[in-house]
Amino acid sequence: MNSFRKTCAGALALIFGATSIVPTVAAPMNMDRPAINQNVIQARAHYRPQNYNRGHRPGYWHGHRGYRHYRHGYRRHNDGWWYPLAAFGAGAIIGGAISQPRPVYRAPAGSPHVQWCYSRYKSYRASDNTFQPYNGPRKQCRSPYSR
């Protein structure tokens, strides 16, 4: 078992050592760059095409476009403030319901006949008023309180 551990440790060391060499071989070599002519001036045109998309413009992205009535598809501003409150509220309600202790349902006191049969026979079953004797089939329980 000890030699197996040594073999595994040696194999892992060999694998890690071999894989660390590969990135150094794959690195690009530094090449001498040609000198840049300093007389060239970079210029950028400052015009926009006719159908230029300005991107996000505050107040116009799914917002009021000047129409008199509400139009479908537009985003109403400031209507998302209640989402986190609803999520935390739902979590609190569900968590409170889960953490409540289970209700304890007490068995009815029963009649003196049932109590007498339970105390007399370990295998007594009140649903059909029988008990299991050591030999034979189940038998009816007959107590001094029998009906």
Swiss-Prot record:
Which Gene Ontology molecular-function terms are recorded? carbohydrate binding
Could you list this entry's UniProt keywords, alphabetically sorted: Cell membrane, Lectin, Membrane, Signal, Transmembrane, Transmembrane helix, Virulence
Keyword RNA-binding in the entry? The reply is: no
> What happens without the gene?
Rough phenotype, with an aberrant O-antigen profile. Mutants exhibit a reduced ability to colonize mouse spleens but are still capable of producing a persistent infection, albeit with a low bacterial burden.
Q: Which family does it belong to?
A: Belongs to the BA14k family.
Described function: Has immunoglobulin-binding and hemagglutination properties, and can bind to mannose. Essential for virulence. May be involved in LPS biosynthesis or polysaccharide transport.
Q: What is this protein called?
A: Lectin-like protein BA14k
Species annotation? Brucella abortus (strain 2308)
